Structures are given as C-alpha cells and as structure tokens.
Amino acid sequence: MSKELAKTYDPKQIEEKMYEKWCENKYFHAEVDRSKKPFTTVMPPPNITGKLHMGHALDNTLQDILIRYKRMEGYNALWIPGTDHAAISTEVKVTNQLKEEGIDKKELGREGFLERTWQWKEEYAGTIENQLKKLGISCDWDRERFTMDEGCSKAVEEVFISLYEKGYIYKGSRIINWCPKCKTSLSDAEVEHEDQDGHFWHIKYPIAGTDRFLEIATTRPETLLGDTAIAVHPDDERYKDIVGKMAILPLVNREIPIVADYYVDKEFGTGAVKITPAHDPNDFEVGKRHNLPEINIMNDDATINEKGGKYAGMDRYEARKAIVADLDEQGYLVKVVPHMHAVGTHDRCGTTVEPLIKQQWFVKMDELAKPAINALKTGELRFVPERFDKIYLHWLENIKDWCISRQIWWGHRIPAYYCDECGEFVVAREMPEKCPHCGCTHFTQDEDTLDTWFSSALWPFSTLGWPDKTEDLDYFYPTDVLVTGYDIIFFWVIRMVFSGYAHTGKAPFNTVLIHGLVRDSQGRKMSKSLGNGIDPLEIIDQYGADALRLTLITGNAPGNDMRFYNERVEASRNFANKVWNASRFILMNMKENVVEKPEDALLTPADRWILSAVNTLAKDVTENMDKFELGIAVQKVYDFIWDEFCDWYVELAKYRIWHAEEDQAAANCVLWVLKTVLGQALKLLHPFMPFITEEIYLALVPEEESLMMSSWPVYKEEWNFPADENVMEHIKAITKGIRNVRAEMDVPNSRKTKVYVVCQDEALCNGIEGMTESVKPLMNANEIIIEQTKEGVADNAVSVVVPDAVVYLPLEDLVDFEQELERLKKEEDRLNKEIKRAEGMLANERFVSKAPADKVQAERDKLEKYTEMLAQVKERMEGLG
C-alpha cells in the first residue's frame, strides 16, 4: 500500500518539517561503531561575519552529497560542522557596530569589547546554522564546534607551546602586511589586490665621485627615505664598472651602496632598482643577502616617523606629494609615467596595506613543510583534480616563515608572558610564578592574538578531541575528504596538512576535492561592488532547496568555476515537478493495491529494458561518485529519470495500467516495475535532491523509516538484459523516426496511421511484436504490422530507415492528397519566385561588385537553399502522383 502525493509540489510544505524529522531521529549523528567503516569530513567553518553566500551553498552542497552517499553505502558517516571566529574580519564588524552606537572601542576596553564580540558570535553563528539547515545539509549538529570554543582553544595553546619548545616558533623582525587603519598585521588572505591607476616616478641617483647617475623608477617615491642600496643584475654589462661604488640618496644625501643581485630583471626599465629593506618583501630578502641596514620610515598609522627628516608627521600620501615636488625642484625628477599596477588593500576596511618591517611571532616553515610535500609525492594525499598538485607544491616549495601574530583583541591570545622587571618572556600554559631570568613574580601577557588560520589549521583533529587521546580521534581520524575552494589551498589546506603531520603524525585527510567559484551569468565573480551577488536563501524561498542544489551541481566539474542564473534554477524546478508528477501518477494508480513481484515470464521487453537501464545507471553513478564526478553523476540520473523513465517507460506503462480490468496480472507487473525503478531512481537522486526524494519515497514505501537511511543501489546481475535493451533502442529509434516524418509533413496528432516494420532479425521482430499495443500511442498508430519483407506495403509509402529495420507509413494515412498537392503547388510557386529574384540579384554585375561581400554570399546561399527546397517539393509532388 502507498500514499498519495499532493497535486503540486510545494517545497515550503515539505522541507522544514522534513528537516526537523531528520534531526529529531538523529539520522545525522554518528558515534564510534567498530563494526562499521567510518567516513569523515569536516566542514570548512564559515566566518561568523554575516550571511552565507552562494559559494558556501556550493561548498556545503558538495559535502552533503558525499556524506549522504556514503551513509547510504553503509559507512558510519560523520560530518562535523562549525564556525570560524574570523579574527580581524569579526573585529572590524563589531568595531563598526560600536561606532554606529557612538561607542569607541578603546574606551570600552579589551574585556568589554570581547563581551560584545561574543554576543555577535552567538547571534551570527545561530544565523549561519539556520541558513545551512535550510539547504538540507546532514551534518552532525550534536558535534558543532567553534574555533574559539574550549576544546579548540586548548588545542591552539598546546600547538603554540609545542612548536615554540621545538624551536619552530620565534619572535623576530620581518616584512609583514600592515593595515594602518586597523593597526595590525594581516595574512595574505586578508589582502585583496586590485589594479589601480598610478605612476612610475623616474628619479636620478647620482653616483658618488662621478658626474654619472642611475635612473630609478618607483611607484612609491615616499619610501626613498628608507633606501639603503641600489641593485643591478650581476650580468648587466651596463653597470659592471659601478658595482661596489656608492650612490647619493636624493634629498637625504646619504651614501648607499650599488650591489649586484639576481633578483633584478635587467630587461625591465633601466635595469636598476632602489632597495628599501624595511618596506618591501623582496627588498627585505635582498637586504639580508647583502647585510643592508633596515630603515623603517613609517609609524603604525602610515605617517612618516622621525627618520623622515622634514617630512616627519606627514601622511604617506602627503609625504609623497612633498617628496616629488622637492625632487622636481632639485632636478632629481626625470619624468612621470602613468602606470596601472596592483595595489594591496585590507579586504575588511579597504585601506591600502603597507609592507612594514615589524617584530612579530613567526613559525619556521622549512622543516614543517617537508612532510606535506612528501605526502603528495607518495600518494598519501591527493587533489581532485590533479592539476592543483602543482599549486600545492609551488606554495610549499617556496614557503616563507609564517607571521602568526595579530594586533587585535578578538582571537586566541598568545600564551607568552613578559616579566615586568627584565622584559624577558616565558611561553607557558599559565602565567609563571617566577621569572627564570631575574626572579620577578610580576608578568604581563602578550597583547597580541593569533592569526585566524592558526586555529583553523588544527580543525580536522581539534574537532575530534585532540590533544586528548579520545576514542573519536582514534576512530574517525584521519578524515577522508576535504571539500574546499581553490582560493584557499595555501591559506588553509597546506596549513592543515603540515599541522596534521606535526601534531598527529598523519595527513588530516587523504583527498582534497577542489571546487571553483560561483560566478554570475556573465562569468563575473559575485561581489558587493558589482551588486551581482545572489542570496541562496532567496532562491530557496522561491524555488526550494532541491532546485538550488541541483542547479549548483549540474554541470559542476571539480576545480572549475560555474555560472549561476535564475533560468538554470527554473530548469531545476521543472525537473522537480517532472519527478513529482510522474511519481504522483504511479502512486495514484497503485492506490490501495499491494503490488507484488511478478513471475519473470510476465515481464515485457520494456520492463526488462527499464530494469536493466536503472541497473546500469546504479553502476555508472557509483563509479562517478567514487571518482568525485558529482556533476556527471547527477546528469546521468537526470537524463534517466526525464528521458528513459518518464518520457518512455511511464508512457509505455499506461496501456497496461488503463487495461487493468482486462489483465490484472499485466497491470500488477507494470506497477511493480514502476515502483521498483522509481524507488531505485529516488535513491540515486537522493544525495542531490534530498527533500523531494524523501517525500516521494515515504509515500511509495511507507513501511520504511527513511530514504536517507536506506541502502544505496548496487548492480544486480539478474537485472542485466542486453537483448531487451536492444529491442527498446530500436523501438525508440522507430518512434523518433515516425515523429520526425509526421512533423515534417505537418500531420496532426489526431490522425492515426498504420505502421509497417520490416526487419529480418527474428528476435527483434518478436520483441517489437510483443509490445505493439503499448507503443501504439507513442507512434500515433492505429495498427502496427511486423513483416520480414516489404510485400503488402504500398509503393508510395513513406519510409524511415533505422538500424536493422525499415519503417513504412502509408502516404494516404498521413495526408489528404488533393489538399497536399494544392499546398505543394503554392510552395513551388513561392520558391520559383525566390529563385528568380536571387538569380536576378546575382546576375546584376553592379550588385556583385559594389555590395558588401557578406551580402553577396548571403544571396548565393539563399539561391542554393531555395533550389534544394524546390527539388524536394517536386519530389513530393511526383510521389503524390
């Protein structure tokens, strides 16, 4: 017995109630079960800085597809959700919120600010959770984590102290990204690079003791105050005689050396560059190689400091104008050339970032990177698709020490304590009782917090209880797959891998599935500035979560960007309606019937064909899923349901359903096949469209608990019917051929015809003959005659050639001869006029020589087309006699 479905599919009536039921029944929850193989993944934790965007929707849809698939395959599937504290991003948001209330962050103080930020976290983490639930994701909400919860904080502290004690963490001076507005260091991920209109200022640097000078081009003339050398390429013949000599720094009149370094591109500009080690990362490295002094000429707010002489106190851009004016006045400015160049800005406040030399906490990366490199080379870790191997290796093989300290309040505070007496620091889990250097008992904790990526790098194992040796960690770790975007391979993926090896001795996952960005219909990245962002919740509200999910996965290929627009969502909704309507038809005809498995002998070729087709589909989709070809997998399911099942088998089934009173056994047989195949198709579709499939499945098989807890379809040898697949492929070809002929001849649907099928293959003939009653409606036939020869077929019958057979349609069944001859005569007259006109145009020498070539060619093409059409019309007229 089955239940009926509502007349139309309304996601709003289903999705929320369905999700509540799943949660109440703990279907998403996983506990250690040694009798099952685990499958684990961790959610890339979204930032608590606002609403989710379409990229989050894609990322979590992909993960949910995998976790639902593995759960149905029988794995003990665990998906750990959570959110990221997002350090500076959140701090900026809360600071702005306070500003709107007229509250100054500094006046509020650290503790007061943190209290407000925790309030923000509670509000937005809950919002994000609700948004994810609307998408239908099946993560274990009982295990939801936060990168600053007690367990994660314990892991962060343990890692910092462990790395410090092993000599990997140190405090030192290096070039970092500095935001003058937020007054903190930034990670590369927090710096957006955008092309801006700027200039190259060409400046003369006199060579000491000569009347020569070097011409240097710079986009930041204000940093001239901190220059400590000029560099040229060692192989540049133009400058070999002056390497080792001194140049005079304009305006400052300080002597600086001319050094040779392979960093210089001798083909770019003049082949000579100014070196400012305290204000450029590349110059910093050159400075280290040549033992150059580092002169920082900027304050934290990007004003010039006391080392800037008369420019001290000026804003960097004010100083730039003043310095350029002075260079021009004193004859050092050669020229100013407009130049478009990339400028780094803080992604949260939009301020132009300054590369500054600062004392910060760093992680030494050379040794930590080695196991992460080896993991890829030995196959312990793989990327899907493989092309991202190169990006991963490039970053690791060129890795620099990681700046982990931030001058903000929101985040994990660095566990370093400074002696109030001697200033030395101690790294410890708790504030020390006594200074090991001077014996003082008073300490102050480091004000800085850790880079947000420091805690998220531990996510795969901190969420399972590390550093404690928990049963969860032993059973569920390492995780199986990480799903993430290609834009954070360096910032997050690499750091998780080396952290996994450093602290657990294992890779945190064995596969990284990379997806691309979601772009708009024009291929542009979605952004606030373009105003082209699409809110996934609005799409869900209008079309339902399943339609959004199907849109995001259809055509999706690992690593590739995708375009998103409403027409695609409408197509997905139409598919949902197609599935619903076909299912409703089946359920209505099952009614109160107990559909039993029929004897094999009762199965028609069409029954065996559709069973064989869904069987092959299960095998193919499983292979695609295991290769992470989720877009290909869902396309196969889509095509099967829409084409083979709905458009062919359901239509073929109608004859036996509607003649149930005449043959109850045949009706039971076809209903069993419909129920069985629909059930299999719903299972294969479920990971992609969980709500609609669950609703239909529970109506189809009400005795079962849940579709998501049912078994994934597996290939059955007893459902392999190649001969019947062959028969159905021929029937489909015959039907399509007949439909094409009828369309070409404008035969109305109400007009039925005889159909002669001539074939020599006895098995094929028998197969088709056994289905003639079912296929008559599809072919608009009133009679189907199977013959091995053409005898009895009228000479003027229209023929359709298909593999292994020829189909004939008596012409008198298709058209009224007199009406058709009259129509063809009119068409002949029209075509003759068009041919005459085109020939006249092409015979006109003036037209041929003066008109644009494309217009002349267009007339030639028309003449050729009309001539072909006229020949076809005449042939049809001759056929009609």
Residue ranges and their predicted role:
Residues K3, T8, K17, K21-N25, ...:
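Residue patterns forming the tRNA-binding/recognition surfaces of aminoacyl-tRNA synthetases
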Residues R34-K36, P44-P45, L78-E91, E144-C152, ...:
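Short, solvent-exposed turn/loop segments enriched in Gly/Ser/Thr/Pro and often Arg
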Residues M1-M54, A77, V334, D347, ...:
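Non-catalytic terminal extensions that flank enzyme cores
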Residues H202, H394-F454, L458, A502-A545, ...:
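Feature 926 captures the class I aminoacyl-tRNA synthetase adenylation module centered on the KMSKS loop
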Residues R68-N76, Q97-R110, N130, K134-C139, ...:
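Secondary-structure transition/capping motifs at alpha-helix termini
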Residues H56-L58, P281-V286, R495-H503, V637:
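Alpha-helical support elements that line or immediately flank enzyme active sites
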Residues E31-V94, T147, V156, I216-T219, ...:
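N-terminal catalytic cores of NTP/NDP-binding nucleotidyl/phosphoryl-transfer enzymes
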Residues A57-I65, E215-P250, V273-D280, H290-I297, ...:
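Extended active-site and interfacial segments that coordinate phosphate-rich ligands
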